[in-house]
């Protein structure tokens, strides 16, 4: 049975980060969309408006599986109340609150980016946030991606330039946790999210990889997505 997937990237990257997994899913006979808000925007829209822009990028289909990577987890939770779906899968991201405000990043990370911003509030592109932290770079998988310089340069060219102020925003989530949801954890960065997902009774799959697993290990990511989807929807 073929499945319909909508793979949503976080605003810090582009849909190209999902493309290796999207291609693998298509090879396996599934239908896939990778909406990219920044394709049609000269500058990134506000976080609180991101879901509305996503909806404009999604071709109508019958109850897709919404998959959010990293900071896209609140986006798929918000999408679920506007777009009938079969289930939600979060890949290496936060577990959004059941309702109420959801910020693009955790408070500790917000404090960190304030420390690396230029005097006008401009931030480096996301791939350079942790340039001085080899361990974090390794957990994310940027060191692996950088082993292919042309591919890494192409990846970086697409990353948006954001300011600190952009992150001082929230999406107001309506009740969404009646929708079946699961978590695929790819890196130790989201150990806390896996604990919260289990507390809520979600299925959790642990892959031994990096944050950029959908980019770097598309075959394993695809298998996990398909298996979890079928387990949840029956």
Task: List each language-model region with its residue ranges.
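Conserved alpha/beta-hydrolase catalytic His-Asp/Glu region
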Residues: 125-174
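Flexible "cap/lid" loop of the alpha/beta hydrolase fold
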Residues: 81-128, 163-166, 198
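Conserved alpha/beta-hydrolase fold motif
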Residues: 66-67, 88, 183
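Gly/Ala-rich beta-loop-alpha elbow adjacent to hydrolase catalytic centers
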Residues: 67-76
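Glycine-rich His-Gly loop
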Residues: 8-11, 70, 93, 186
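Conserved serine/cysteine hydrolase catalytic core
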Residues: 157-219, 223, 229-232
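Active-site loop/oxyanion-hole signature of alpha/beta-hydrolase fold enzymes
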Residues: 31-65, 103-116
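Conserved HGGG/HGGXW glycine-rich cap/lid loop of the alpha/beta-hydrolase fold
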Residues: 2-41
């Amino acid at each position: 049975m073929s499945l319909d997937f909508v793979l949503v990237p976080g605003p810090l990257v582009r849909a190209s980060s999902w493309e290796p997994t999207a291609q693998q899913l298509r090879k396996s006979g599934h239908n896939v969309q990778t909406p990219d808000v920044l394709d049609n925007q000269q500058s990134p829209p506000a976080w609180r408006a991101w879901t509305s822009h996503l909806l404009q990028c999604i071709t109508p289909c019958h109850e897709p599986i919404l998959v959010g990577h990293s900071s896209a987890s609140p986006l798929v939770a918000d999408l679920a109340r506007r777009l009938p779906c079969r289930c939600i899968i979060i890949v290496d991201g936060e577990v959004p609150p059941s309702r109420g405000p959801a910020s693009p990043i955790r408070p500790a990370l917000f404090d960190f980016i304030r420390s690396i911003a230029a005097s006008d509030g401009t931030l480096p592109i996301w791939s350079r946030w942790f340039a001085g932290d080899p361990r974090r770079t390794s957990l994310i998988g940027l060191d692996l991606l950088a082993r292919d310089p042309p591919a890494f340069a192409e990846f970086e060219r697409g990353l948006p330039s954001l300011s600190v102020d952009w992150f001082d925003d929230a999406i107001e989530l309506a009740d969404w946790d009646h929708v079946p949801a699961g978590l695929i954890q790819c890196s130790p960065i989201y150990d806390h999210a896996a604990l919260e997902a289990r507390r809520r009774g979600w299925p959790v799959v642990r892959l031994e990889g990096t944050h950029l697993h959908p980019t770097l290990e598309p075959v394993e990511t695809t298998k996990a997505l398909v298996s979890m989807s079928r387990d949840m929807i029956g």
